[in-house]
Every structure is written in C-alpha cells, then in structure tokens.
C-alpha cells in the first residue's frame, strides 16, 4: 500500500552545515529545497570550527603552492585532479561566502590599505587561512542559517533524522535504479515520515562519534556513510580518521578543540616538565601535519605515563592572545585556566573522517540522483591526512559544483506522487533501552583502544569480532522495536565502525593517519582503499 507524501521537494538535503546550507542557498532560487537537521539547525561540526578556510588571497601565495601543500599533507595518495579542482575554485567559493555576509577578520597593511588577516596553520607554506577571530565556523554557520531560514523556497526541518534512503528498485519502481527520497524520523512527533525528492544530497558530516574521545558534536554518527552503503554506494579510505592533536583535557569540557591557529601563531607543545618535544619528531616542529603531531603526543603520553601534554602560548603578549583567540581565552578562563599565563593541558581526539562515500567532481555517488558533499564524502582531496582548513573549503566547492549538476539534471528527473509508508506493523515499544546504552559505550571504547592512533592486526581483528557481535544484537533490536534517535545513531555507527576496520585491515603499510606496528613502512605504490557493498575489495 502506498501513501500520499508527507513531504515533497525537488532537492532533499540531509544536513545543515556549511555543505548543506551553501548548496541549499545556491539551489533555492530555482528549486524547492528541504533541509533536514538532526537537532537545532546550527548544531553540527561547522558551528564549532575554529580555524578558518584556506584560499589564495595573498599575492605572494599561489594555487600551485596550495596544491603542493595539500598533496604533501595527504601523504602521497591525494587525487591530484581533486586537489587542483578545489584549490583553483577556492577563492571564488570563499568570495561567494563573503557575498552572503560572512565577515572575515581584516587588518591595515603598512601602506594603509585594508586586507584580510590571513593566518598560517600546520602543513601550509604560506599564510592563506581566512578566519573570523577563533570562531570562523560560528560566523559561517549563523550567516548561512539566517539566509536559509528567510528564503521562501527552503524548508528547514529541525529534530529530524533520516532513517534510510528510499531506492527505486527496493520499492518496485521500474527503470534506472535511483534514489526517490528518504524515510525521516520526526523526533517531535516520534514517528517516521516519508519525503520524496527528485535529488537527495547527503551533507551529514563525519563519523568521529565512533570513538570515545572526539572534538565533534554528538550528531557526528556517520549517518550518511551508513545510509549510502546500505543503498549500494562504494566507500573509500575510511581507515584515515584524523585525530586532532590538541583537544582540551578537562573533565568539564571534553569536546573542546584548541585550534591549529594557536600553533600557527607560535604556541609550543610541551611535556609536563616544560620541555618541548616536537623538534624531536619533525623539522617543522609544531607546524608539522596533524597526523605527525597527534602521534608524537600519543607517543610521549605513553612513554611518560602521562595523562596529557601541554600547549603553551604564554610567551606571546597577552593582548595579542586575547585579540586573536577571544573565544578560547574566555572559555578557558571560565574553567580556571589563563591562556596568557599558563600552559593548557591537551590530548588528541577524533576530529575528522578523511574517507567517505565515493563521489565525482559534482558530488555524484554510485546511485542515480544521490549526492554526497562535505565530510561525508570521499573526493580524493585529503588523501591519507587532511590539511588544516581545507574542510570548510571542500564543503563550499562541492556545494557549488553539486548545485550546478543538480540544476542541469533537474528537467530530466523522475517525479512520483506516492511512496510506501514506514511499516511498524510488526514492532513494539522497546523494553530494554539499557541495551542501546551499553552497546554504545562498548563500541566507542574498543574503537578507541583497538582502532585509534596506533593499530595492530590483532587489535583490528579483535575489534571486528566485537563489531560483528554488536551488529547481530542491533539488527535484532532494530527489527523488533520502534526506532529512536539513539538506536538510529548506534545502528549507523556500528556499520561505519565495520567499514573503518575493514579498510584498515586492507592497508598493509603505515601512511598518514593510519599507523600500524605490524606494517610500519610505506609501500612504494599505493592508492585508496575502496569497499563495495556485497563484495568487499581493495582497489589500489
């Protein structure tokens, strides 16, 4: 039995960060758009991004330099075409953001002219990071949200989780296999609704919540990667999860990130005894790429048996620190730490998913009509390690590129008037919610211990056995009980955990963010780790 559609649009965008909202605004003058947000519309990784956006605005810088820096940080397996595509379109996409009203910091040059204040971060050979103090993501997100909420062709559905994608062949529709919409969990009504769309875009962010310690907000549960996999899309390079070197080590602020820009402006990493250690690991010192810095911190913590290392910028003038890092300064002061006077305790934490759903230059996946942009996707830009401040840039460039392709294809898109309703005829209300909570904590703990910064084959095998057991329990629970937010996220996280481990087991080398004691050397020839649904394989 089919039902009239509860929601219908030209384009359904799942996710409300920089990728999803920039795409929505580019499409909305010509198309009807629905944006799903799991929580409040501003909640997501974009809002919490501190550093900035990389683009060539300085006349002493060049696109070629941006490309080469990205390739070096990516440890030899970036897709050069993707890197050149993003770097060459960076300035125009950042300019679009400025045209929307985003205010980046400026300063007065010695000649009296005003220009953007550009910072330098790890891996960059030039100052090319546009920023809004130390809260760039907040400035970007609040500006885009304001524009989206006031656009007549954009509907934002808050507290709405995508349960799964609706694929044509799975509901008996003839013709080319394509996405026709999604089932959506309305958390306010506690019911699953149907949403038809001529095109669906995954802009759901990454999967760092699969780890016990993360800088990401709670919504980063790998939903888009898991849904795309279940829909039949390939994924790639999920073994490369970036651990940000400097998350605050404090019981009252476990998810708080200390931006790369602190080290870009001269902060040192120190042992508990006050000595620096980064020069022992890399000639670039504190400005080495994140994978090297995170491993160095992890090494020193384990070698010394220390709970944390320290980040120290107190040798810089206090006014300079307060001017450039006002949000961090106030946050730390509220926790009893004076950034201008003392070192800050830090630990690495899961931060960014460098792999994801395989896409082309326009964000197209393996399923007709389905796109993936931003952190959920694998474009080839990041390779084995993302360079600082390339993530928001990737959101903007592929938001633009996907909008061009969707608009070009929209006249030929299929339209339908009914979809099958969500079937709850054989499920009941859950009676043991503790099962979800227990499995949730178990998953995140063993992923941190076995599939973290340093790995071994035995640890990966042990993790995969645990994942298989959890999947059986969760699948049984999902089949018999009504859905909930925690169940949906756990189901997706366990699926992504499996994909991460399988990718990691395929890579018989240590490269970038994937470091294994069993294969500490680099292979001479390497490439992306690609998984295909129903036929796990590697393609190098």
Swiss-Prot record:
The record marks 121 as: Important in orienting the L-aspartate substrate. Pathway: Cofactor biosynthesis; NAD(+) biosynthesis; iminoaspartate from L-aspartate (oxidase route): step 1/1. Its main location: cytoplasm. Keywords: Cytoplasm, FAD, Flavoprotein, Nucleotide-binding, Oxidoreductase, Pyridine nucleotide biosynthesis. It catalyses: L-aspartate + O2 = iminosuccinate + H2O2; fumarate + L-aspartate = iminosuccinate + succinate. SUPFAM superfamilies: FAD/NAD(P)-binding domain, Succinate dehydrogenase/fumarate reductase flavoprotein C-terminal domain, Succinate dehydrogenase/fumarate reductase flavoprotein, catalytic domain. One of its GO terms (molecular function) is L-aspartate oxidase activity. FAD binds at residues 16-19, 38, 45-52, 223, 375, 391-392. It holds the Pfam family FAD_binding_2. Its EC number is 1.4.3.16, 1.5.99.-. One of its GO terms (cellular component) is cytoplasm. The active site is at 290 (proton donor/acceptor). Its cofactor is FAD. It is found in: Cytoplasm. Binds 1 FAD per subunit. The keyword Cell cycle does not apply. It comes from the Bacteria. One of its GO terms (biological process) is 'de novo' NAD biosynthetic process from L-aspartate. Belongs to the FAD-dependent oxidoreductase 2 family. NadB subfamily. Catalyzes the oxidation of L-aspartate to iminoaspartate, the first step in the de novo biosynthesis of NAD(+). Can use either oxygen or fumarate as electron acceptors, which allows the enzyme to be functional under aerobic and anaerobic conditions. This is L-aspartate oxidase. It comes from Escherichia coli O157:H7.
């Amino acid at each position: 039995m089919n039902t009239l559609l509860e929601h219908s649009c030209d384009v359904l965008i799942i996710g409300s960060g920089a990728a999803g909202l920039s795409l929505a605004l580019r499409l909305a003058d010509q198309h009807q758009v629905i944006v799903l947000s799991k929580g409040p519309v501003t909640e997501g990784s974009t809002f919490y991004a501190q550093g900035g956006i990389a683009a060539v605005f300085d006349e002493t810088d060049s696109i070629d330099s941006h490309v080469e820096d990205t390739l070096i940080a990516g440890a030899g397996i970036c897709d050069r075409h993707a890197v050149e595509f993003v770097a060459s379109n960076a300035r125009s996409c950042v300019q679009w953001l400025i045209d929307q009203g985003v205010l980046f910091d400026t300063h007065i040059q010695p000649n009296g002219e005003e220009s953007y204040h550009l910072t330098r971060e790890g891996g960059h050979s030039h100052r090319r990071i546009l920023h809004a103090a130390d809260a760039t993501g907040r400035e970007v997100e609040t500006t885009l949200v304001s524009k989206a909420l006031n656009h007549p062709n954009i509907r934002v559905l808050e507290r709405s989780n995508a349960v799964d994608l609706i694929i044509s062949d799975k509901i008996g529709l003839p013709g080319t296999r394509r996405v026709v919409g999604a089932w959506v969990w309305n958390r306010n009504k506690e019911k699953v609704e149907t949403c038809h769309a001529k095109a669906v875009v995954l802009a759901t962010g990454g999967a760092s919540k699969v780890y016990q310690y993360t800088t990401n907000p709670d919504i980063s549960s790998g939903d888009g990667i898991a849904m795309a996999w279940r829909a039949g899309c390939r994924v790639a390079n999920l073994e490369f999860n970036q651990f940000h070197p400097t998350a605050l080590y404090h019981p009252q602020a476990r998810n708080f990130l200390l931006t790369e820009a602190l080290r870009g402006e001269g902060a040192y990493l120190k042992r508990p005894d006050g000595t620096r250690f980064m020069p022992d690991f890399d000639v670039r010192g504190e400005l080495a790429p994140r994978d090297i810095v995170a491993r160095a911190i992890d090494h020193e913590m384990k070698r010394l048996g220390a709970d944390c290392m320290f980040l120290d910028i107190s040798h810089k003038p206090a006014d300079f620190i307060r001017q450039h890092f006002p949000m961090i300064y106030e946050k730390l002061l509220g926790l009893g730490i004076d950034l201008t006077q003392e070192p800050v305790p830090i630990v690495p934490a899961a931060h960014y998913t460098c792999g994801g759903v395989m896409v082309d230059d326009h964000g197209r996946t393996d399923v007709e009509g389905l796109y993936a942009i931003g952190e959920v996707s694998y474009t080839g830009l990041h390779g084995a390690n993302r360079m600082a401040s390339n993530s928001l840039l990737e959101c903007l460039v592929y938001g633009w590129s996907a909008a061009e392709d969707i608009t070009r294809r929209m006249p030929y898109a299929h339209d339908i008037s009914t979809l099958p309703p969500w079937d709850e005829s054989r499920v009941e209300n859950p009676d043991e919610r503790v099962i979800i909570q227990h499995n949730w904590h178990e998953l995140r703990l063993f992923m941190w211990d076995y599939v973290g910064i340093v790995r071994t084959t035995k640890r990966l095998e042990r993790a995969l056995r645990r994942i298989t057991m959890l999947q059986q329990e969760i699948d049984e629970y999902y089949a018999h009980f009504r859905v909930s937010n925690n169940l949906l996220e756990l189901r997706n996280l366990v699926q992504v955990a499996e994909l991460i481990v399988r990718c990691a087991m395929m890579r018989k080398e240590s490269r970038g963010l994937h470091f294994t004691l069993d294969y500490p050397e680099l292979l001479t020839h390497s490439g992306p780790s690609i998984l295909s649904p129903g036929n796990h394989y590697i393609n190098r």
